[in-house]
Design a protein with these regions (language model features):
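Alpha-helical transmembrane signal-anchor/signal-peptide segments
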Residues: 48-57, 112-133
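Short tyrosine-centred short linear motifs in exposed loops/low-complexity segments
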Residues: 165-167, 174-181
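Transmembrane alpha-helices and immediately adjacent membrane-cytoplasm interface residues
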Residues: 89-118
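Long, highly hydrophobic alpha-helical transmembrane signal-anchor segments
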Residues: 1-39
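Juxtamembrane interface at the cytosolic side of transmembrane helices
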Residues: 44-54, 258-275
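Membrane-interface amphipathic helices and adjacent TM-edge segments
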Residues: 45-94
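Extended, hydrophilic extramembrane loops/domains of integral membrane proteins
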Residues: 182-238
Length: 275
C-alpha cells in the first residue's frame, strides 16, 4: 500500500510544485480544472453520448409541452410522467461514468486533504502529540519519551490515558522547517514529521499509522509504522485550514467540488461532451 501512496502522492507534489509560494486558491483552481477535464473525459468515453443527447432533447420537448398545454390537465400530467421517465433514463446513462469516477475521486480527495486540510504550526504555537497504542499494550507499562528537537520543545510530561490506550504530550513550535518528532518506546524509536511555518501550500500529514489497508488509505502522507510496533498511530493536532473568499471562510471540499463542476459545465460545449 505504501508504494501506491508514495507514487500517487508524488504526482500531487509535481502538480502543486509551482504553487507552493502562491495563495492556495491558485493550486485549488488548477486541480479543480484538471478534475473538471477528467470528469468530462470519463463522461465522453464511458457514457452513451448519443443517448444522453436524445434524452435531454425529449425532456426539453416535454417541458415545452407543459408550457404550451398548461390549461389541459391531462396533457400536462402525461408530459410530467414522460419527463420523470426520461429523467430516470438519463440517470441510468450517467450511472456508468459515475461508477468509473468514484474511486479516483476518493483517492484525489484523500490527497487534497493533505494539501488544503491543515495549517502548519507557527513558532510559539502549541499542539498535542497523541500516541495511540495497540490494544494489547498498557500505556502505564511502557517507557515513552520524545527526543529533543531544534524545531520544537516538549511543553508537558506525558499524559497516560489507560482507558484510551493513549499517551499525549504538548509541544511548542520554535523554528520553521520540517522536523522529525522522534518517540522512543523502550529501546525502539519511531518518527513523525512536524511542519512548522511552511509555505502557503504545503503537504501536511496529521497522522502516521500502523500497517492497515484502511488506515493507510486515509492517512497516506507518511510511511506506515512497522507492523511489530506497539504504536497504532502518532497524531499531531494541526488546526484545520479554510479557504478565504472575501472574508468568507469555506471548507476546501466545498470549493473544490463547486470549481470542478463549474469547469466541467463550462468546458463541456468546447469539448463536445454531453453530461
Amino acid at each position: 500500500m505504501w508504494f501506491f501512496n508514495y507514487s500517487w502522492g508524488k504526482i500531487f507534489e509535481f502538480i502543486f510544485f509551482p504553487f507552493r509560494h502562491l495563495n492556495p486558491w491558485w493550486g485549488m483552481i488548477f486541480i479543480s480544472l484538471l478534475t473538471g477535464l477528467f470528469m468530462l473525459a470519463v463522461f465522453k468515453y464511458t457514457s452513451n453520448q448519443k443517448g444522453i443527447s436524445q434524452v435531454k432533447n425529449k425532456i426539453k420537448a416535454h417541458l415545452l409541452e407543459i408550457r404550451l398545454f398548461k390549461d389541459n390537465f391531462a396533457l400536462s400530467l402525461k408530459a410530467q410522467g414522460n419527463i420523470l421517465r426520461y429523467n430516470l433514463k438519463y440517470i441510468s446513462y450517467s450511472f456508468k461514468p459515475m461508477l468509473v469516477m468514484i474511486i479516483p475521486l476518493i483517492l484525489i480527495l484523500i490527497q487534497l486533504n493533505l494539501w488544503f486540510g491543515y495549517h502548519s504550526l507557527e513558532p510559539g504555537q502549541k499542539a498535542i502529540v497523541k500516541v495511540k497504542l495497540k490494544k494489547e499494550y498498557n500505556p502505564l507499562d511502557l517507557k515513552l519519551k520524545i527526543d529533543p528537537s531544534p524545531g520544537f520543545r516538549v511543553d508537558s510530561p506525558p499524559l497516560r490515558i489507560e482507558e484510551e490506550k493513549e499517551v499525549n504530550w504538548r509541544i511548542q513550535a520554535k523554528k520553521k522547517g520540517i522536523y522529525s518528532l522522534v518517540i522512543k518506546v523502550d529501546n525502539q524509536s519511531y518518527q513523525k514529521n512536524v511542519a512548522i511555518s511552511q509555505n502557503s501550500l504545503t503537504k501536511i500529514s496529521p497522522a502516521k499509522v500502523n500497517k492497515n489497508f484502511w488506515a493507510e488509505l486515509l492517512y497516506p502522507g507518511e510511511q506506515p509504522l512497522s507492523s511489530d510496533s506497539p504504536l497504532e498511530s502518532i497524531e499531531i493536532t494541526y488546526s484545520s485550514k479554510k479557504m478565504n473568499l472575501f472574508g468568507l471562510h469555506l471548507h476546501w471540499l466545498i470549493v473544490y467540488f463547486v470549481l470542478s463542476i463549474i469547469f466541467g459545465f463550462g468546458l463541456k460545449g468546447f469539448l463536445k461532451v454531453q453530461i
